[in-house]
Amino acid sequence: MRYNENIIQVKPSNIGFSLDLTAMMTAADQARAAQPFWTSFFAYLFNQLPPSAEVPLRYKLDEARVRSYLENEIAARYDQGATAYEPVQGSVNFLAGDPGQTLDVDRSVTLVSNALRSPIARSVNLALVRGTLSRPSMNELRIMLQQIIDVNEFTGEVEIYMQDLNTGTDLQLAYRGGETLTPGIAFSAHSTIKIAVMVTAYRFIDEPASEEVIQLVQEMIAKSDNVSTDALMREVLDRTLGPLEVTRTMKALGLTSTYLDGMFYVGAPLLSGGVTTPANSRDDVDTEPDPYNQTVPTEIGMLLTDIYQCAQYGGGSLLAVFPGEITQSECRSMITYLTQNRIGVLIEAGLPDGTQIGHKHGWAIDPLDGLMHAVGDAGLVYTPGGNYVLAIFIHNSDQIVWGDANQLYADLSRVVYNYYNLGTQ
């Protein structure tokens, strides 16, 4: 037997093969006895050999012993299990492991049995199965994300939400200056809240939507136009209280820390005078979230998941909570608008060219000091290795430098992409 370069010699008797000599001798004696006595006697006197008779080779083969030998002596000794990809500390890459190989016992039993029956082909190349490289664990990915934040020397608050759209497995990470925080931090939503505005608007848009409404949605998402956002809410929701309808829609979906409390135009009033949420009620962390619009990465990520499930499968929370108000075709339109938001930075910057992403980003300059303090981006990412939701929000009370923030986003996005596409990194 050959297992790759390893040669194993084995006695047939040790693996359950033996000749059935008794049966063959009996068959030969029966062939002799079948000849007429006097004919055989005179042939013997004149030294004449009797005619030959074919006696079939008979054997006994215990395939259970063959299997046992292969499993306990060969596979146990020579099989090599696969080793997973390993994270490269502080980088966005993974080091390839070894796929390993194992004995295909069922196929090898057949091959060995055939060789035992053959008088000529007495050697066997055992059948092997090449393993597959396994993906690192979610915990290893979480550690890599923390290391990337450290390498980028970002000392403010970072919260990341990622969900596998195939399995539903998710990852939540809240981090600040080497310290792990409890996820669910309130961040200024900025323009990411326009995802919620879009979902709410479609509750009240009758199909087919008018060209005017379609244009407003496109400009709100693809161009992040605040004027169009206010116009959409006035046109479809309510001329004054449209933002409150957005908040009610989010609460109906169970997203209790995501809200919009005013229009986007400068000087717009707070409609509720301030909204208290589970996230902004925390006293262990404060990102100074905008009182007009807030969210947490988990909730904006879950909202994107709802849109995806609605568009992809015609199911999910949107259709369950708002039956008859939102349709699968409308969800597909939402994703189309999100994919038109092409900016080449933040999460998008970490993706290879040609990768499809539907996302909404948001940031603002503080009018008091003229600095940027918070950035958010949340999107649906479609890749060969799997589709996922990724939401990343960051805050720094001192200042966020755009170039540094974009590099951090690109690195965090890239490591998640590589995690799903290990063979192409």
List each model region and its residues.
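Active-site SXXK
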Residues: 185-208, 220, 390
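Surface-exposed patches in mature extracellular/periplasmic domains of secreted proteins
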Residues: 80-85, 121-127, 157-162, 207-217, ...
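Mid-domain, small-residue-enriched loop/turn segments at the edges of structured enzyme/sensor domains
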Residues: 233-322
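Surface-exposed, secretory/extracytoplasmic low-complexity segments enriched in Ser/Thr/Asn/Gly/Pro
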Residues: 1-179
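Flexible glycine/proline-enriched surface loops and loop-helix/loop-strand junctions
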Residues: 50-52, 178-184, 213-214, 225-233, ...
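Active-site-proximal beta-strand/loop segments in catalytic clefts of secreted hydrolases
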Residues: 163-165, 175-177, 201, 221-224, ...
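Short, well-structured active-site flanking segments
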Residues: 203-219, 224, 242
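Structured C-terminal helix/loop/strand segments within mature extracytoplasmic catalytic/sensor domains
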Residues: 292-295, 302-425
